[in-house]
């Protein structure tokens, strides 16, 4: 029966920095990993991909039953060339209806035998998917979480034990013999029992664990597979992000997007009664995480507004309320990862891109640590007549680029750059692992201004030692230029036009926030 269906092998190749030119997504009430939005003249179109194709294999690995983000990750990690085995939409739906073993499509028996000798065990028609690591959020009731910690002879790390029935720990999803990987976003795999106990005590009345159950750990160990924190299950977390779909009305969407000097990110304010925003379930003080499938955690106010405008008459927002934002920050996870475990509604897309992690909440500091030193800096540079006024250096054979010879009074100096600052991001893109030449090219090709996330040497070493990813939301918000102090800008646009209006230019105004009606 399988022979009546003819999958196609599409070999895609691209230049460094180029996209393949298609979206890979899942849709509600539709099975399979779908190919959508193929760009004209792109590698995807040239390779023969068609809208509605279902991806069966990536570089020979059967992926039809895999988690969507694992499939996306396989494409992303393929580098500049990838081979996709696809089946057109109609054939795929017929094959599923006839209960055809999709794994047999496109391979001979000899090929199947060879693969079976060299790949992981097969289960349910695909490469066996081990249970994911999972996040568990515990909020103390009384004096106890309801668990104990133990070490196991001959094993590295700390494990959960003595889970009290109906306790906070049990209700949060903690299991006996779970291996503790992280405490509030900090890796503890190499920590001693005493160090982990101390971290739990210091956490106060709430804590987030990244845990791996006994069977999962055993299988990963046997297969020598490393745990990927971005693949962790978020399903047990009590506060979740929300996907809000809206269509613009005659007066716009009916909400304001605001950001102030003390506010991280962009928040929803002043939702109009009876507006599309209210009908869609948007709430005041919601924090915007993504717009139309793209993370905006590293974007400034204008960047977020521009993405919403590009959506035309409809938009999809991923938002979190204060409780969810607080919990995800405590876990040091980005709410953007919520897309991993969701079947996105029609019109939403998951791009082949890495999500941005979020820093943990500020907890009670150790009095012996200089906490203020452990912050990255966001620096916006406007090019002068003689350039930006600094040199970019790198050490051969070592990752990372760093700042040298910052000229006094230059745009770099005025923006806060200092000698030895390590470049983490260029215009929101992490460049820590990129070669020196590519970092230089990113800065040079950014035009007359560039935004850099940098970290001093001492702070960088601290974050590396703690295994804490460095991201822009850890930094203080960008300073507002002196010539714009006291000005409140509001952009208002509807179906017909976009216009700007200044509310006030009074020098004694107390508001430095950005405020955009949508």
From Swiss-Prot:
GO BP of this protein: positive regulation of protein targeting to membrane; protein localization to plasma membrane; regulation of monoatomic anion transport
Domain of life: Eukaryota
PDZ domain ranges (all copies): 9-90, 135-215, 243-323, 378-458
Subcellular localization(s) per the UniProt record: Membrane; Cell membrane
Residue(s) carrying Phosphothreonine: 451
Keywords, sorted A to Z: Cell membrane, Membrane, Phosphoprotein, Repeat
Region annotated Disordered, chain positions: 499-518
GO cellular-component term (any): apical plasma membrane
Modified residues (Phosphoserine): 108, 148, 192, 250, 334, 348, 507, 509-511, 513
UniProt key word Lipoprotein: no
Statement: the UniProt record of this protein carries the keyword Phosphoprotein: yes
Free-text domain note: The PDZ 2 and 3 domains seem to be involved in the interaction with SLC26A3.
Function summary: A scaffold protein that connects plasma membrane proteins and regulatory components, regulating their surface expression in epithelial cells apical domains. May be involved in the coordination of a diverse range of regulatory processes for ion transport and second messenger cascades. In complex with NHERF1, may cluster proteins that are functionally dependent in a mutual fashion and modulate the trafficking and the activity of the associated membrane proteins. May play a role in the cellular mechanisms associated with multidrug resistance through its interaction with ABCC2 and PDZK1IP1.
Family, as annotated: Belongs to the NHER family.
Protein name in UniProt: Na(+)/H(+) exchange regulatory cofactor NHE-RF3
Species of the source: Oryctolagus cuniculus (Rabbit)
Underlying gene: PDZK1
């Amino acid at each position: 029966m399988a022979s009546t269906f003819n999958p196609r092998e599409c070999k895609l190749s691209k230049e460094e920095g180029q996209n393949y030119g298609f979206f890979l997504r899942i849709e509600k009430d539709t099975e399979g990993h779908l190919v959508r939005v193929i760009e004209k003249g792109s590698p995807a179109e040239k390779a023969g991909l068609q809208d509605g194709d279902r991806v069966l294999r990536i570089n020979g690995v059967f992926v039809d039953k895999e988690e969507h983000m694992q499939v996306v990750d396989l494409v992303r990690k393929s580098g500049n060339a990838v081979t996709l085995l696809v089946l057109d939409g109609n054939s795929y739906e017929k094959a599923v209806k006839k209960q055809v073993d999709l794994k047999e499509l496109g391979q001979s028996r000899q090929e199947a035998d060879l693969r079976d000798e060299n790949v992981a065990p097969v289960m349910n028609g695909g490469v066996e998917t081990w249970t994911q690591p999972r996040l568990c959020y515990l909020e103390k009731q009384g004096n106890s979480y309801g668990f104990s910690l133990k070490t196991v002879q001959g094993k590295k790390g700390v494990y959960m034990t003595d889970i009290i029935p109906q306790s906070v720990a049990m209700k949060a999803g903690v299991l006996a013999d779970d291996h503790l990987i992280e405490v509030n976003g900090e890796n503890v795999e190499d920590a001693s029992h005493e160090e982990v106990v101390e971290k739990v005590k210091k956490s106060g009345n709430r804590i987030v664990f990244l845990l791996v159950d006994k069977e999962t750990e055993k299988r990963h160990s046997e297969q020598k597979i490393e745990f990927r924190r971005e693949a962790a299950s978020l399903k047990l977390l009590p506060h979740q992000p929300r996907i809000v779909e809206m269509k613009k009305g005659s007066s716009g969407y009916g909400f304001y997007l605001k950001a102030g000097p003390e506010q991280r990110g962009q928040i929803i304010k002043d939702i109009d009664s009876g507006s599309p925003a209210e009908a869609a379930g948007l709430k005041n003080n919601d924090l915007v995480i993504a717009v139309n499938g793209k993370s905006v955690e590293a974007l400034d106010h204008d960047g977020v507004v521009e993405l919403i405008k590009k959506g035309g008459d409809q938009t999809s927002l991923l938002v979190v309320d204060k409780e969810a934002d607080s919990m995800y920050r405590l876990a040091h996870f980005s709410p953007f990862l919520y897309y991993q475990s969701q079947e996105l509604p029609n019109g939403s897309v998951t791009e082949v891109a890495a999500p941005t992690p979020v820093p943990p909440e500020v907890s009670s500091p150790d009095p012996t640590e200089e906490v203020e030193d452990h912050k990255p800096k966001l620096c916006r540079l406007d090019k002068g007549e003689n350039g930006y006024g600094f040199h970019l250096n790198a050490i051969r054979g070592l990752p990372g680029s760093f700042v040298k010879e910052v000229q006094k009074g230059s745009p770099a100096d005025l923006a806060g750059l200092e000698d030895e600052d390590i470049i983490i991001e260029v215009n929101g893109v992490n460049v820590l692992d990129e070669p020196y030449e590519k970092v230089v090219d990113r800065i040079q090709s950014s035009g007359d201004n560039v935004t850099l996330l940098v970290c001093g040497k001492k702070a960088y070493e601290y974050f590396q030692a703690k295994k804490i990813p460095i991201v822009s939301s850890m930094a203080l918000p960008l300073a507002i230029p002196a010539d714009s102090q006291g000005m409140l800008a509001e952009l208002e646009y509807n179906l017909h036009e976009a216009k700007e209006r200044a509310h006030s230019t009074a020098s004694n105004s107390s508001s430095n926030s950005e405020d955009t009606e949508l």
